[in-house]
Amino acid sequence: MEKIKTKDPRFMIRFATSEDAGLVLEYMRKLGTYQKMLDKITATEEGIYKLLSENKGEVIFGDYDGETVAFIYFFNNSSAFIGQTGIYIDGFFVEENMRFKGLGKIMMAFMSKLAIERGCKRVEWGCLDWNESSVRFYKNIGAVGVDTMTIY
């Protein structure tokens, strides 16, 4: 598996394969715990394996000094509203001890670049309203929230 260099020589990005399904599930559970929603994570390793092997979802991992410390789960979407494709980030997590080192910013910059390379016009994700530190992070990288709708 190819490791993609970043501006931090100790931090590399790599795409997951279906064989990484267990690690993806582990990170989804970490995210669920952080979001106080672990009981909502009902995915199984087999389900994640299927999503990855059928190219219905993708994952990038962030490895720091060879150890996985971050992940993003995403998939392609489209909008009749703008008549364009995009990328939707369904899960994003950086290990707590690795936050505030610029790694999340590197991961999101990679996602923006990937979207452009794939001809997508936007990258979207959700963020829980109570998660003020994440809201600050997203605003700091230039993201603009949509506060005129509720997702059901």
At which residue positions do the language-model features occur?
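Conserved active-site alpha-helix within GNAT-family acetyltransferase domains
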Residues: K105, D129-T148
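Hydrophobic adenine-recognition pocket in adenosine-nucleotide-binding enzymes
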Residues: A16, F92-V94, C127
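Acetyl-CoA-dependent GNAT
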Residues: F11, F15-A21, E26-Q84, L114
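Conserved GNAT acetyl-CoA-binding A-motif
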Residues: I116-G126
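Conserved acetyl-CoA binding element of GNAT-fold acetyltransferases
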Residues: Q84-E96
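Conserved acetyl-CoA-binding loop-helix of GNAT-fold acetyltransferases
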Residues: V94, F100-K113, N140
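Short hydrophobic/aromatic beta-strand or adjacent loop that forms the aromatic wall/cage
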Residues: G57, D147-I151
